[in-house]
């Protein structure tokens, strides 16, 4: 089971209703500051030291943000609360802090090289590019042209060279998610802790995705943090544990002070599931611009361990 908490969605919004005109409230040192629009929220967060545009001195980089004095404290508080709840307060979870740079083989076996894509459309008139599923109609949002290309897959993973020689072979990816190193370290953790099922491995860290169209402030960015738990269970008990974690995580968000009326569970449709998932339940929050995912809880079955151990008998893992 994979629990992926999307840190980028949870920095400061305290109250909002989906589709309503209710303002967003940001609490700063005990004073409620009202932001009625996303632009006002962005401006307020900058003035008060929550979030700045990254590299703003040189024009900024789209989809990248820096957290200021108040922002970093708020992020740290949230991460510490999550870690305490998921690791320290439980006797069946171990921690991990894995490398950001990831071997291509890891993402080949996991299926990311083939499937971690977004549908990309080009405008032939102004040369702008858009995610196909972001377009309300087949018309360029920049120039209003209807002369668009057919959608094609665009890989979201960042590549970087390893070592001094750029020969096209010695490269790695910046990890697009925090889950895969948990699976590749499964046997290491098992051997060093002598754990028995069920047990989990938790990790907090950066992930990187070369988003086609970053948007809505920090709601879709190219660099962000995830709080991840992979919980390993005996065959046949997966649905029971999925329900347990959905209820546990929903209660955790309420315990952080979120109004339950603003939370909603969404079962992802079969044709929308990630390539690794049998069932996914998203915990959604009603932001001013609509429902957005706070956390995804997925029944990954044995897809990941099975993928990484297939043809690698030296790992001696049966999933």
Over which residues does each language-model region extend?
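TRNA-recognition modules of translation machinery and tRNA-sensing kinases, especially anticodon-binding
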Residues: 33-319
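Leucine-biased recognition of intrinsically disordered, low-complexity hydrophobic segments
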Residues: 1-3, 25
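Short, low-complexity segments with poor structural confidence in diverse proteins
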Residues: 4-9
């Amino acid at each position: 089971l994979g629990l992926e908490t999307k840190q980028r969605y949870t920095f400061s919004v305290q109250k909002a209703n989906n589709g309503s005109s209710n303002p967003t409230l940001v609490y700063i040192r005990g004073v409620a500051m009202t932001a009625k629009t996303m632009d006002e929220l962005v401006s307020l967060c900058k003035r008060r030291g929550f979030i700045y545009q990254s590299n703003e001195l040189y024009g900024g980089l789209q989809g990248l943000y820096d957290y200021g004095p108040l922002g970093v404290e708020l992020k740290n508080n949230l991460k510490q609360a999550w870690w305490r709840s998921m690791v320290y307060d439980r006797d069946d979870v171990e921690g991990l802090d894995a490398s950001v740079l990831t071997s291509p083989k890891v993402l080949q076996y996991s299926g990311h090289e083939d499937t971690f894509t977004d549908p990309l459309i080009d405008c032939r008139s102004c040369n702008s590019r858009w995610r196909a599923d972001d377009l309300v109609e087949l018309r360029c949002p920049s120039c209003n042209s209807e002369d668009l290309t057919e959608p094609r897959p665009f890989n979201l993973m960042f590549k970087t060279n390893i070592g001094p020689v750029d020969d096209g072979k010695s490269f790695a990816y910046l990890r697009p998610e925090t889950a895969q190193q948990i699976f590749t370290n499964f046997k290491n953790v098992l051997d060093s802790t002598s754990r028995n099922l069920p047990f989990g491995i938790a990790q907090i860290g950066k992930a990187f995705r070369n988003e086609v169209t970053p948007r809505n402030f920090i709601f879709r960015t190219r660099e962000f943090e995830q709080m991840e738990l992979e919980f390993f269970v005996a065959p046949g008990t997966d649905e029971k544990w999925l329900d347990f974690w959905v209820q546990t995580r929903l209660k955790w968000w309420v315990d952080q002070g979120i109004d339950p009326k603003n939370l909603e569970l969404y079962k992802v449709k079969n044709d929308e599931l990630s390539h690794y998932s049998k069932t996914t339940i998203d915990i959604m929050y009603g932001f001013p611009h609509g429902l957005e995912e706070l956390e995804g809880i997925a029944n990954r079955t044995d897809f990941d361990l099975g993928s990484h151990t297939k043809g690698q008998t030296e790992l001696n893992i049966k999933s």
